[in-house]
């Protein structure tokens, strides 16, 4: 049997067809148990979706179920996904870049119809036994600006197909934190209390207290300048319960509940980088595509391909000016208002979301900034 490597690299109102796409990434995130987490649900779901297109048999059935799609909805969902990608526009103050590359070994016979339909999305032929790592890194860096996204541990002599998607986001806050007001402050987690650099801003934001099964959480939306992308922050006593409750539909609902308030917001600066093998997570959703005896990608080739590796590398930096995030399966306050104090001095969840499509570009948890 031939093996396939999927590597997802990361550095919304959803249509009903794409809510399953978003939820697949959320479900994957919920299976990560680290303290500090940065993950790209979009990057994960995009890799799974692009694996669905050539899939057949049980592999296609499982991936359709993962995306909560009926067979007849696959074509329209793909059209909506491509349309949604076009809405992730770069502006003067924000930079959003997503690339997709499918590298197929020269020995694999690709069906002409599949090539005709999907080669424009980044289909490359190469010899995986001849300097494939350098060739792939060169192409990915040229298209995305990210360097060294694959190494020799990710590719081997069994690799005949590698799917790589990258997502890079750099955004400037619409209401930046004043760097002169950043002070050391206490942050308390399950390990105790530590001192962290705490940013501070007084401004009008959208926020509210949301209730989930009698548990209350403070949620606030930090918009990025000149873009339809926001970071949503949530804090409460039981953040595990909050995370377990997240779905694409609930994020839509919660975002509509947020109202304008003047906040004195305090948020720690933080930087998180994760490199993880996510094969076991994907295998829970679509096991047959990892099984040499059951995997089927016959819409692309008659060669017996199966997936044997799946990774995601993700990184995020948040400071006074804004956010830099990448993945390699990611108003003025009125003086008459008394600002509502909201300090993120205990573990919290962050979500970077495209508010037009509902795509969750990045999502994570800060346990120890």
Curated annotation (Swiss-Prot):
Keyword Signal: yes
Induction details: Expressed in the intermediate phase of the viral replicative cycle.
Residues of the signal peptide: 1-15
Compartments where located: Virion membrane; Host cell membrane
Major site of localization recorded for this protein: virion
InterPro entries found in the cross-reference section: Serpin_dom (IPR023796), Serpin_fam (IPR000215), Serpin_sf (IPR036186), Serpin_sf_1 (IPR042178), Serpin_sf_2 (IPR042185)
Highest taxon of the lineage: Viruses
GO MF annotations in UniProt: serine-type endopeptidase inhibitor activity
Gene3D superfamilies: Alpha-1-antitrypsin, domain 1 (2.30.39.10), Antithrombin, subunit I, domain 2 (3.30.497.10)
UniProt keyword list: Host cell membrane, Host membrane, Membrane, Protease inhibitor, Serine protease inhibitor, Signal, Virion
GO CC terms: extracellular space; host cell plasma membrane; membrane; virion membrane
Membrane topology: Peripheral membrane protein
SMART domains attached to this UniProt entry: SERPIN
Job of this protein: Prevents cell to cell fusion via its interaction with A56 protein. The A56-K2 complex associates with components of the entry fusion complex (EFC) presumably to avoid superinfection and syncytium formation.
PANTHER family: GH10112P-RELATED, SERINE PROTEASE INHIBITOR, SERPIN
Subunit record text: Interacts with A56 protein.
Similarity section: Belongs to the serpin family. Orthopoxvirus OPG040 subfamily.
Protein name: Superinfection exclusion protein
Organism: Vaccinia virus (strain Copenhagen) (VACV)
Underlying gene: OPG040
